[in-house]
Amino acid sequence: MNKKPLEQIKNVTNVTGYRQVSLWKREDLQHPQPDELAEEIPVALVYNGISHVVMMATPKDLEQFAVGFSLSEGIIEHRREIFGMDVVSVCNGLEVQIELSSRRFMGLKARRRALAGRTGCGVCGVEQLNDIGKPVQPLPFTQTFDLANLDHSLAHLNDFQPVGRLTGCTHAAAWVRTTGELAGGFEDVGRHVALDKLLGQRAEIGEDWQHGAALVSSRASYEMVQKAAMCGVEILFAVSAATTLAVEVAERCNLTLVGFCKPGRATVYTHPQRLIAG
């Protein structure tokens, strides 16, 4: 199979995350106009030579995505358990080739064997309903967050969506300091992928999870809550609503879940004791 380094790939627009196209506007169907579309391509995560999952994603920040996915899915517990990564072009997509520690790879293979022997229920690729909820250690209560500082974060979330500003087609995930300042953020066509990129970047730079919160531009699904909790995030802010299962998972793992985050507004679903009204 022909493979080449990511920086040599021509069909992902030098990893800008978007592609220029021609299209037609309603008021003028005779003359095409230039515009931009967000890139969405298959990205396979391959652990020690075995393909584990294929996700549709924006072809940017894929190493951070791989680290975040590995942590939030319980494949690893620490960044140091990944020994190396390469991003290569294959067929019509990309592979992130990840070298895992032997112990973690054995655990991943055991989990795959357990899933392969069951009758599938077809829920989002999970083999049985009981497998939807991953075991998450209850989070500690180590911090407080003044909601008066959230408005600043919301006003600047779009700063981390350059592709979104061009295309109107990406989700964002950013880290909010307790002061309300944003300390890094990522975008992707997939809301889960954007969050994984953020979680991966936090792990890459060795930052702790006890000083701040995650902010996402999307709704809060149970997967988003579970991913955040798996990495030790105590507070998750979402611009849109939360689902019932998200609230149940957040309650069970002691995560403070807040939805409908707009300037001057926030709806707290679980564990408000970490928050200061404002």
Swiss-Prot record:
Domain of life: Bacteria
Primary localization: cytoplasm
Any one Gene Ontology molecular-function term assigned to this protein's record: sulfurtransferase activity
GO cellular component terms attached to this protein's record: cytoplasm
GO BP of this protein: Mo-molybdopterin cofactor biosynthetic process
Keyword Methyltransferase: no
Stretches of the chain forming a coiled coil according to its record: none
Compartment(s) where it occurs, according to its Swiss-Prot or TrEMBL record: Cytoplasm
Residues at the active site: C121
Keywords from the named record: Cytoplasm, Molybdenum cofactor biosynthesis
Family matches, as InterPro entries: Cytidine_deaminase-like (IPR016193), FdhD (IPR003786)
Binding site for Mo-bis(molybdopterin guanine dinucleotide): F260, C261, K262, P263, G264, R265
Entry keyword Cytoplasm: yes
Free-text function comment from the UniProt entry: Required for formate dehydrogenase (FDH) activity. Acts as a sulfur carrier protein that transfers sulfur from IscS to the molybdenum cofactor prior to its insertion into FDH.
Annotated family: Belongs to the FdhD family.
Annotated HAMAP family: FdhD
Name of this chain's protein: Sulfur carrier protein FdhD
Source organism: Klebsiella pneumoniae (strain 342)
Gene that encodes the chain: fdhD
